């Protein structure tokens, strides 16, 4: 397993709520959110809602439900709202979007690699070796 990734706030660059301060969940009580559908991953959905409630974001104002992070980032870049995304999305973030840490958003995202041990593929073995070498 690689070290867990964290969630970040994706916001349009220059968004009023994000200027010059340490961000907390409660700062986004009135912000429009772009959110993923609960049916896509009920456990993840319920857990992130629980973390939000604990941080004072008791009822996120969800203005759009989507199914993937690419769509989330596109809608954030169109200034439709803000969203929580994996920190790894910085590799393909649109220019108009900034990723910001939220100090009380404690929600690690573990990454696991699963493969069949009896698969003799040399390509698979090299891939697994690369992933293992990348672990910190």
Regions found by a protein language model. Name each.
Residues 1, 5-6, 70-118:
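Beta-alpha-beta core module
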Residues 1-7, 11-33, 116, 122-125:
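Flexible hinge/capping segments at coil-to-helix
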Residues 59-68:
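Short beta-strand-to-loop elements that line the ligand-binding cleft
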Residues 110, 114-136:
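Extended ligand-binding regions for polar small-molecule ligands
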């Amino acid at each position: 397993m690689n070290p867990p990734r964290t969630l970040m706030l994706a916001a349009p660059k220059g968004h009023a709520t994000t200027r010059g301060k340490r961000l907390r969940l409660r700062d986004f009580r009135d912000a429009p959110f772009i959110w993923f559908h609960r049916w896509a991953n009920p456990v993840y959905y319920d857990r992130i809602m629980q973390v939000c409630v604990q941080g004072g974001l008791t009822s996120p104002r969800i203005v759009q439900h989507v199914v993937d992070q690419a769509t989330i980032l596109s809608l954030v870049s169109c200034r439709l709202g803000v969203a929580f995304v994996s920190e790894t999305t910085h590799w393909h973030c649109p220019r108009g979007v900034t990723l910001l840490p939220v100090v009380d958003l404690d929600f690690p995202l573990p990454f696991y690699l699963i493969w069949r041990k009896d698969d003799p593929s040399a390509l698979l073995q090299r891939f697994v070796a690369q992933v293992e070498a990348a672990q910190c």
